[in-house]
Amino acid sequence: MKIVMYHYIRKFNRKLPFFKNFLKKKEFVKQVNYFQKDKGIIKNINEIKYNKDKYLLTFDDGLKEQIFAAKILAKKGLTGIFFIPSLPILEKKFLDVHKIQILLAKIGSKKIIEYLNKNKLYKLSIKNIKKKDVKKFIKAYSYNKDKKSNILFKKNMNYLINSVNRSQILDEMFTKFKITESVDKYYMNVSDLIYLKRLGMKIGCHSHSHNILSKMSKKNQFKEISKSKKILEKKIKKKIDFFCFPYGRKYSYN
């Protein structure tokens, strides 16, 4: 079985001039049509056990724009698994991983690096990065063809700087650069998840905060995953049977 993972499916937005890592809607439709003609796409999750050649389509992060993809799949009698982090559902807040994406998309890495070079908390956080983490996450984003400055910012923030300092730095940057993105427009809400369920889509959990699990104790890993599962099950009134690791690389969860 081939698993194809999606995040951003949208058209170019002039308000996000530096954001290019997305799939155009028409390209998504082309891909679905190709997968259908090739080996076929999973129509029922029970098929997973018996269809080694078919494609399974998955969608991470609970992004509002993914509703478009769900509608396309439903029209074709297909299904996909949508992996939802529960913090935006529960607290109506941006995940740090998406604050990073929004900053890069709106103002670009050049201005970000210029700002961070003058930020005392950022410089202190860089000094306090643990050598074992640098070694553990040496391959982070090595597969990525993004700009080096983008990769540096994402790697430091997502993998190396401690989460408390990271959140504070990102919040300061949102204020400094007057970022006014809407959480409600960015993420799916409970009504959207129930709508996906009606369309025949499957809901899975994607942790609570989308933080690096391999930096947590086993106890906190359990809390992070079980909390997400409980919140989603309570909200959509359906058992959650699927889980997808944030980031997905072995070093991010092992």
Which residue ranges define each predicted feature?
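Catalytic alpha-helical scaffold of carbohydrate-active enzymes acting on polysaccharides/glycoconjugates
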Residues: 1-242, 249-254
